């Protein structure tokens, strides 16, 4: 086990003492050592209410091989050895003597686990207080810090009773759980937008669900974590509308210019406002939906309000879904504007009674994963006031990069046949209310047909519809600080979405952080080896509470999880830069790779059908040395590596080839070859319900990325797809003459990948990708000019 920690601060001793006193500990350096030790260790068992109960708890802790903590304290000691203190500390952190560590040498385990310690014996009360302060900020076996663990057991439950008025509590630069999340006020309001997406002549009203600390009713104003969640009110069965992958790749007869595919923002309609008949300070509707994001729940107990809005076209709101369109961005912005006092909301949809977010400080962070993170990124590119930061996990920065690639229809990994119209149906939760649906069904079906037409599955080309859903082109407007989290094995929302957004905001005068993990489309807030919750606590305390805690400097710019060394996270200044830390090597496909042939015929669809394969089984087979698809691919290998190497950046392919057809699909996979136990792409549960989100509150599982039980022969590092008629970009078209050579350039997905010595790099070039592209029936023959083809690989040095 490794408990990496990036968010721990080391303030001077006076600050440490003041903070210890603030959380209710006896922390006077002039007190006798024995009295201070007794007071402190007794305080660490808040679940024990009497001295007798505390004595029993102390007797359960071993100081060394000879005595318990209760017996040691009874001797009124005047000092404590470093070894004895950390024997006690480890047990307080949840580790077991004799099982997890040796009482004769706790430091061996602490070093391996990356737990901090003082480097000397405790010979004074000041030493003891320093050790206790560090202990409180040390991570436990249960992922959270020791102070968090104490608070989960009731240590801070009476904090507010001792204050003249409700307040936030900060410790080590981070806000603490001193609010009872069980008592949160739950309410619903309807925010007036500027849009009429269902074309009924009225501004769409957008439902927003609010959970705010009860202390706001006593005058406390709080910042807000806002999650724009289209799934919040449920989803629909999309089996009937999911596309069957087409069997013919269209020959494109004409392309377009950049100007022709550039979307121009539409002027907002001059719609009348909903009438106002009065104002209220209390909502009329209870929030019946439960909060569904553990990250937000964690901060609710720390004095942040949490707001969800599903947006246009969802249950209890007006409008129609647009799958990432400007209307969905505007809907998220409308919620922020209400939270900052710049837009009206109503207590219900009919009476015209307005209500303000009077409990809000007007400082907002947007959070969430996938579609939720996408809307956070979209809102940030508007530059809306009040949005201080986004914490965006696996977000889409351009919807073309989600459903298309280089002129091809490309499904997100794991969802073959999905497209923008399918997702619109999936999230159109208004249809769950029959009384609502009967009034809008015809108009919705007409609207949906427009999406199906405009997404253009025939050519897969980039057009104005997709351009309107490319948030990166407005990245220069971003004013909010940005945290991006992404899985390096996320073939659903592929890594290019994060890295291209990261590059787009690189020169902006904002703070930005990037976390890259080895998972697929998953959260990391409950991964034990990373102190992600503490990192974001430090970040949000700075961003939303205005604490000068140095978060922008303490937290690394880039944190990346290693794919070989277990539970290892490394800090870097940037991704794929600066030049002093990186090098690119261009390798010729003929002289630097071994290949049995330079040509293949793509029979993948026939093989797929004959094998009764699935998308998942195809993805395994296409990168397996001995495969049923061996004749439908080109397999190129490099010699085994003589030393460890780390790929970091965007692999780039230059390829000269000829095909026997006027169009074709080319897929490329970069492979790590060699039998090994590699990480699973989904973190495994290591403690069921082990992460507690607040005192007597919700729990969630603790996870960890682990190597697979059995070795595998290969693993996908990166991939790319291209329509061979689109060698330059996704809108200009090249005519292909069958049998005549032509050239293409292709960027693969960004990666950070550690290749150990002895492994081999392999390059797989094939045609249709059964898991992601369409599935042509017609076979195509590919002839690759290896001598005039190359791949450029980026390395961290």
Swiss-Prot record:
Disulphide-bridged cysteine pairs: none
Keyword Cytoplasm (UniProt): yes
Biological processes per GO annotation: proteolysis
Keyword Flavoprotein assigned: no
Active-site residues from the entry: 370 (charge relay system), 490 (charge relay system), 521 (charge relay system)
Catalysed reactions listed for this entry: Hydrolyzes Xaa-Pro-|- bonds to release unblocked, N-terminal dipeptides from substrates including Ala-Pro-|-p-nitroanilide and (sequentially) Tyr-Pro-|-Phe-Pro-|-Gly-Pro-|-Ile
Enzyme class name: hydrolase
Signal peptide region: none
GO CC field: cytoplasm
Keywords: Aminopeptidase, Cytoplasm, Hydrolase, Protease, Serine protease
GO molecular function: aminopeptidase activity; dipeptidyl-peptidase activity; serine-type peptidase activity
The EC number(s) this enzyme carries: 3.4.14.11
Subcellular location per the Swiss-Prot or TrEMBL entry: Cytoplasm
Subunit relationships: Homodimer.
UniProt cross-references to NCBIfam families, sorted A to Z: PRK05371.1-2
Its job: Removes N-terminal dipeptides sequentially from polypeptides having unsubstituted N-termini provided that the penultimate residue is proline.
Annotated family: Belongs to the peptidase S15 family.
UniProt protein name: Xaa-Pro dipeptidyl-peptidase
Species this protein is from: Lacticaseibacillus casei (strain BL23) (Lactobacillus casei)
Upper lineage: Bacteria, Bacillati, Bacillota, Bacilli, Lactobacillales
């Amino acid at each position: 086990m490794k408990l990496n920690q990036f968010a721990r601060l080391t303030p001077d001793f006076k600050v440490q003492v003041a903070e210890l006193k603030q959380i209710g500990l006896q922390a006077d350096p002039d007190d006798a050592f024995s009295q201070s030790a007794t007071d402190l260790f007794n305080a660490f068992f808040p679940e024990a209410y009497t001295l007798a109960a505390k004595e029993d708890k102390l007797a359960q802790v071993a100081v060394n091989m000879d005595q318990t903590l209760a017996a040691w304290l009874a001797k009124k000691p005047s000092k404590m050895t470093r070894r004895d203190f950390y024997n006690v500390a480890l047990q307080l952190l949840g580790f077991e003597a004799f099982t997890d560590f040796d009482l004769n040498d706790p430091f061996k385990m602490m070093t391996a686990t990356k737990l901090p310690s003082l480097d000397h014996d405790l010979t004074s009360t000041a030493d003891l207080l320093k050790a206790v302060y560090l202990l409180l900020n040390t991570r436990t076996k249960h992922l959270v810090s020791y102070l968090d663990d104490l608070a989960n057991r009731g240590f801070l439950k009476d904090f507010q009773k001792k204050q003249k008025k409700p307040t936030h509590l900060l410790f080590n630069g981070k806000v603490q759980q001193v609010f009872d999340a069980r008592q949160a006020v739950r309410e619903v309001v309807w925010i007036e937008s500027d849009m009429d997406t269902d074309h009924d002549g009225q501004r769409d009203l957008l439902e927003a669900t609010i959970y705010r600390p009860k202390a706001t009713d006593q005058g406390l104003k709080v910042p807000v974590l806002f999650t724009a969640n289209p799934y919040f009110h449920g989803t629909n069965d999309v089996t009937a509308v999911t596309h069957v992958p087409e069997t013919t790749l269209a020959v494109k007869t004409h392309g377009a210019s950049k100007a022709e595919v550039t979307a121009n923002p539409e002027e907002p309609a001059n719609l009348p406002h909903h009438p106002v008949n009065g104002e209220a300070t209390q909502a009329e509707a209870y929030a019946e939906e439960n909060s569904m994001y553990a990250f937000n729940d964690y901060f609710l107990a720390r004095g942040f309000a949490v707001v969800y809005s599903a947006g246009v076209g969802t249950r209890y709101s007006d409008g129609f879904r647009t799958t990432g369109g400007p209307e969905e961005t505007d809907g998220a912005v409308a919620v922020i504007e209400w939270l900052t006092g710049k837009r009206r909301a109503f207590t219900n949809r009919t009476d015209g009674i307005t209500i303000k977010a009077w409990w809000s400080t007007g400082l907002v962070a947007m959070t969430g994963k996938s579609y939720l993170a996408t809307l956070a990124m979209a809102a940030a590119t508007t530059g809306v006031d009040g949005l201080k930061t986004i914490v965006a996990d696996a977000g889409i920065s351009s919807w073309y990069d989600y459903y298309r690639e280089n002129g091809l229809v490309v499904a997100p990994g794991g969802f073959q046949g999905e497209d923008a119209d399918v997702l619109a149906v999936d999230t159109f939760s208004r249809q769950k209310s029959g009384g609502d649906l009967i009034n809008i069904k015809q108009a919705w079906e007409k609207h949906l047909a427009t999406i199906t037409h405009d997404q253009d599955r025939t050519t897969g080309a980039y057009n104005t519809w997709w351009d309107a859903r490319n948030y990166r082109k407005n990245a220069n407007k971003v004013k909010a600080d940005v945290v991006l989290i992404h899985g390096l094995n996320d073939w659903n929302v592929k890594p290019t979405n994060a890295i291209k957004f990261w590059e787009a905001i690189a020169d902006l005068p904002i703070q930005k952080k990037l976390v890259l993990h080895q998972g697929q489309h998953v959260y990391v807030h409950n991964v034990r080896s990373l102190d992600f919750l503490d990192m974001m606590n430090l970040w949000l305390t700075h961003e939303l509470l205005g604490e000068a805690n140095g978060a922008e400097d303490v937290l690394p710019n880039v944190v990346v999880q290693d794919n070989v060394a277990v539970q290892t996270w490394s800090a870097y200044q940037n991704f794929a830069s600066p030049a002093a830390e990186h090098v690119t090597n261009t390798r010729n496909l003929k002289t630097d790779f071994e290949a049995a042939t330079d040509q293949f015929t793509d029979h993948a669809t026939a093989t797929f059908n004959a094998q009764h394969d699935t998308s998942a089984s195809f993805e395994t087979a296409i990168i397996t040395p001995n495969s049923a698809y061996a004749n439908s691919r080109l397999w190129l290998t490099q010699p085994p590596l003589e030393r460890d190497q780390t790929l970091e950046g965007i692999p780039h392919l230059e390829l000269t080839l000829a095909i026997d057809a006027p169009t074709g699909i080319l897929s490329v996979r970069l492979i790590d070859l060699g039998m090994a136990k590699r990480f699973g792409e989904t973190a495994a549960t290591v403690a069921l319900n082990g992460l507690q989100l607040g005192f007597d509150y919700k729990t969630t599982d603790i996870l960890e990325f682990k190597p697979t039980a059995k070795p595998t022969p290969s693993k996908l590092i990166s991939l790319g797809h291209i329509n061979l008629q689109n060698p330059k970009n996704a809108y200009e078209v090249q005519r292909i003459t069958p049998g005549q050579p032509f050239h293409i350039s292709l960027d693969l997905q960004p990666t950070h990948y550690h290749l150990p010595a002895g492994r081999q790099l392999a390059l797989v070039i094939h045609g249709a990708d059964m898991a992601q592209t369409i599935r042509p029936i017609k076979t195509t023959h590919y002839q690759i000019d290896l001598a005039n083809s190359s791949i450029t690989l980026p390395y961290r040095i």
